[in-house]
Design a protein with these regions (language model features):
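Conserved Nudix-box catalytic region and its N-terminal flanking loop in Nudix hydrolases
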Residues: 1-29, 37
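Beta-rich nucleic-acid/ligand-interaction surfaces
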Residues: 41-61
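Secondary-structure boundary elements
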Residues: 28, 32-46, 73
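Intrinsically disordered, low-complexity boundary segments flanking structured domains
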Residues: 36-38, 51-53, 79-85
């Protein structure tokens, strides 16, 4: 599974209109540090779509879940990650899966420890619609 998880930092992620942190700046930083993606060359902040909000009551943490559409092929991302990125240790591996409901559902259902199920579900519904995604999932 590949994810970008970053803590929001006021000084590091400060927006351009004041001292408040900017969630898009935080996401851009995470994409750079964990996957080696460069803003402007590989994506823009406008390519980031936040899809849902989550809260861990056990750890008193909140999270924004979303997707980003990048201008790179998956082989470019894997090669960049393999060559070393700042926070490579935060992901154990990158397992490319075609982004279709069928391929993603097959992957998720064969990897029981897969922890991004809610995020993946929201991303699939965003791209393909709830009815289609639910029908694919129901076939398992």
């Amino acid at each position: 599974e590949t994810s970008v998880v970053e803590g929001l930092s006021r000084p590091t992620d400060r927006g351009t209109h004041g001292d408040a942190p900017d969630i898009y700046r935080c996401a851009c930083r995470g994409l750079a540090e964990e996957l080696g993606l460069r803003e402007s060359a590989d994506f823009s902040a406008a390519d980031i779509t936040f899809l849902s909000f989550g809260v861990s009551t056990q750890y008193a943490l909140w999270a924004l879940r979303g997707i980003v559409k990048i201008k790179r092929d998956v082989s470019d991302v894997v090669a960049r990650w393999d060559n070393g990125v700042k926070d490579k240790f935060e992901n154990q591996d990158i397992l490319p899966v075609p982004f279709t409901p069928q391929d993603v559902a097959s992957f998720v259902f064969t990897h029981q420890s897969f922890s991004l199920k809610p995020t993946i579900y929201h991303a699939l519904v965003h791209e393909f619609g709830r009815e289609h995604v639910d029908a694919v999932i129901a076939s398992y």
